[in-house]
């Protein structure tokens, strides 16, 4: 993923030797603590009973770009070994693409040379690197008081009521600030698990203390950059900011956010636009929602095609699957938002150095 000043490249495959990330553009002097990085990676494992039975230790190995506990300003490379991959079953289904997965288009794209085991490079396993990128971005944002947090807004038909940013950031629950809604979400995930099926959901992400002035029109649009980043996450099928698609039902008099003065600075009375106008941050909390489709790998029979015989066949998957990926997606969504914000913040600071 390439920003103007920050970029990262993911490498590895789900069942390969390792996965990892190369991050370029990080300034020198960011303090790095491996235990903090590991804590972020632990969050990516989600709620155990609804996650894959694949158990990876996810020990990050910093290969370059960090010395004596601080970034050096040169490219950062971090490696995470794959220790618990089981590829045996994937040989049986290599010619029967799994519905909902990238198996078929990937085979076409790469002329059949792609690593099909566990989804290969298309696997959610690659988000290990995304979370690592997010760790570095969050450390940079911390210097300016910017914080990013995501929570589960919906699982299937169960929705968490809208929460204020203060309530979200004060909540001890790492998944959802509304305990009643969270219990009902757990029940919905359990129903899917027991039936051999899966369930989708929505993640809401909020960033606070974001200064006004990040972004710009057209190619500099921060919403466009955020949406592009969020859509790169496997299983994401929708992104909206502020009230999003609800704007289509409203009048301008309802939708507009009146400007007011709060504590000596310009703010808006409401935040329907999610902290962005004209592709530029307003100084209000940045709010986005991300829709995740249900995990495509399920234990129920599905129809597919045998690509060798060109026959329609029934596919019954065996393996280790998530019944819901939404809980483990929280640090991934945070990471993408933090990385885009960090890139735009560095751009803004460059301008400030010239103009001011």
Curated annotation (Swiss-Prot):
Molecular function as annotated in GO: chorismate synthase activity; FMN binding
Which chain positions lie within coiled-coil regions? none
Q: Gene3D superfamilies recorded for this chain?
A: Chorismate synthase AroC
Q: Which GO terms describe its biological process?
A: amino acid biosynthetic process; aromatic amino acid family biosynthetic process; chorismate biosynthetic process
Cite the binding residues for FMN.
121-123, 278, 293-297, 320
Task: Provide the alphabetized UniProt keywords.
Answer: Amino-acid biosynthesis, Aromatic amino acid biosynthesis, FAD, Flavoprotein, FMN, Lyase, NADP
The record's annotation in Pfam families points to: Chorismate_synt (PF01264)
Cofactor(s) named in the record: FMNH2
Residues that bind NADP(+): 44, 49
Pathway as given in its UniProt record: Metabolic intermediate biosynthesis; chorismate biosynthesis; chorismate from D-erythrose 4-phosphate and phosphoenolpyruvate: step 7/7
Provide the cofactor note recorded for this chain's UniProt entry.
Answer: Reduced FMN (FMNH(2)).
According to its UniProt record, which reaction does this protein catalyse? 5-O-(1-carboxyvinyl)-3-phosphoshikimate = chorismate + phosphate
- The residues that cross the membrane are none
Name the enzyme's class: lyase
A Gene Ontology cellular component where this protein is annotated is: cytosol
Q: Which domain of life is it from?
A: Archaea
Q: What is its EC number?
A: 4.2.3.5
Q: What does this protein do?
A: This reaction introduces a second double bond into the aromatic ring system.
In the record, the note on similarity to other proteins reads: Belongs to the chorismate synthase family.
Task: Report what the protein is called.
Answer: Chorismate synthase
Source organism of the structure: Thermococcus gammatolerans (strain DSM 15229 / JCM 11827 / EJ3)
